[in-house]
C-alpha cells in the first residue's frame, strides 16, 4: 500500500462515518463517503460534506450506496475504482440500533436489522475483494461494538447482528491471510453519536405489555449507557491509526471505549481459544494466525 490510502466508508452521512471521513481526509487520505440517497433524504448531509471538502481542499467524494442493495453497492465500488484506480480500505460502518424486549421485536424488524448490520458488510466485502485481490493488498474494517462481545437485556437483536458481523469478519481474517488482505474488527463502547438518536424499538407493544414492569428495561439500559458516553473522536482517531498501520502489523480486534465492559478479557480468552482450535484443526499454518496479533488497543 502507498502511504496515502483510498478509503471507502459506508454510512458517512452522520455519526462515526462522518467523523471517519473528516479525520482521514484531513490526513491526506482519499475518502469515498457513501450514503443512501445523497440527492434525497441525505441531501443536506451530502451538501455539507461537499462544501467542507471544497472549502478545506479535502480529498472527499460523495457517492450513493445503499448497503441493503447489491446493485447499489456494486455501482459505488465501481465508481470509486474508476475515479481513484483502487480501493485500499473499506470501512463497514453503516448500521443502526434495534432496542426492545426480544419478544416485542417482529420478524420483519429482525430481517431489516440483519440486512443492514450484517448482510450490508457481506455485500460491500464481496464487491471490493476482487479489486483488493488484484492489488494483493487491502484492509476490511468492520465497525462492530462492545455489543458484539457482551449482551444486555433489550439489546438482544442488536447484539445478534454484531455477533454475526464479528464471526464473519474473523473468518475472513483467516481466509484472506495469505492474499495480503487484512480483516479488522473495531469494537466501540458507548459514544455519543446520532445512532442513538434514531434507535428503532420493538414494534409489538402487545407482547411488550405482557412483561409488566420489565417493559421499562430498554429505557433503563439506554439511561445507563448514555450516562457514561465518551468523545466519538476517540474512535475516529483509532480508525486513523489502524488505516496508517503498516500492512501485516494490524491486529484482528481493537476495543475502543471509555467504559470497562470486560471486552478486553473476553477478547484475550477468545484469542487463545481460537489459536488452539486452529492448531487442533491443522490450520494454523494455512491461516498464518499470529497469536500475538489477535487483539489489541490503539
Predicted regions and their residues:
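The beta1-alpha1 cofactor-binding region of Rossmann-like NAD(H)/NADP(H)-dependent oxidoreductases
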Residues: 64-75, 107
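Substrate-binding pocket helix/loop in short-chain dehydrogenase/reductase
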Residues: 101-102, 109-111
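A glycine-rich helix->loop->beta "capping" turn
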Residues: 56-59, 79-92, 98
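Canonical Rossmann dinucleotide-binding motif of NAD(H)/NADP(H)-dependent dehydrogenases/reductases
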Residues: 2-36
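Residue(s) in the substrate-gating loop at a strand-loop-helix junction
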Residues: 145
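C-terminal beta-strand-loop-alpha-helix "lid" module of Rossmann-like NAD(P)-dependent dehydrogenases
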Residues: 175, 179-225
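Active-site helix of classical SDR
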Residues: 125, 161
Amino acid at each position: 500500500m502507498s502511504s496515502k490510502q483510498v478509503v471507502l466508508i459506508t454510512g458517512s452521512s452522520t455519526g462515526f462515518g462522518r467523523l471517519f471521513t473528516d479525520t482521514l481526509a484531513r490526513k491526506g487520505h482519499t475518502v469515498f463517503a457513501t450514503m443512501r440517497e445523497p440527492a434525497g433524504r441525505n441531501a443536506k448531509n451530502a451538501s455539507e460534506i461537499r462544501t467542507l471538502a471544497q472549502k478545506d481542499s479535502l480529498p472527499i467524494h460523495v457517492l450513493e450506496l445503499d448497503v441493503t442493495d447489491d446493485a447499489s453497492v456494486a455501482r459505488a465500488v465501481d465508481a470509486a475504482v474508476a475515479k481513484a484506480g483502487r480501493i485500499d480500505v473499506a470501512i463497514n460502518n453503516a448500521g443502526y440500533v434495534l432496542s426492545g424486549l426480544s419478544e416485542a421485536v417482529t420478524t420483519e424488524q429482525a430481517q431489516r436489522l440483519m440486512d443492514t448490520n450484517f448482510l450490508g458488510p457481506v455485500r460491500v466485502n464481496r464487491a471490493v475483494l476482487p479489486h483488493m485481490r488484484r492489488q494483493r493488498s487491502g484492509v476490511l474494517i468492520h465497525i462492530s461494538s462492545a455489543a458484539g462481545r457482551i449482551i444486555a437485556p433489550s439489546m438482544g437483536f442488536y447484539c445478534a447482528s454484531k455477533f454475526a458481523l464479528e464471526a464473519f469478519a474473523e473468518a475472513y481474517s483467516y481466509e484472506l491471510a495469505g492474499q495480503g488482505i487484512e480483516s479488522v474488527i473495531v469494537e466501540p463502547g458507548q459514544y455519543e453519536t446520532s445512532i442513538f438518536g434514531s434507535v428503532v424499538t420493538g414494534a409489538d407493544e402487545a407482547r411488550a405489555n405482557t412483561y409488566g414492569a420489565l417493559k421499562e428495561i430498554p429505557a433503563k439500559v439506554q439511561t445507563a449507557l448514555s450516562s457514561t458516553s465518551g468523545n466519538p473522536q476517540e474512535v475516529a482517531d483509532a480508525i486513523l491509526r489502524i488505516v496508517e498501520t503498516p500492512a501485516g502489523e494490524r491486529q484482528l480486534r481493537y476495543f475502543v471505549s471509555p467504559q470497562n465492559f470486560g471486552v478486553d478479557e473476553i477478547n484475550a480468552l477468545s484469542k487463545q481459544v481460537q489459536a488452539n482450535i486452529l492448531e487442533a484443526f491443522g490450520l494454523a499454518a494455512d491461516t498464518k494466525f499470529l497469536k500475538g496479533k489477535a487483539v489489541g488497543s490503539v
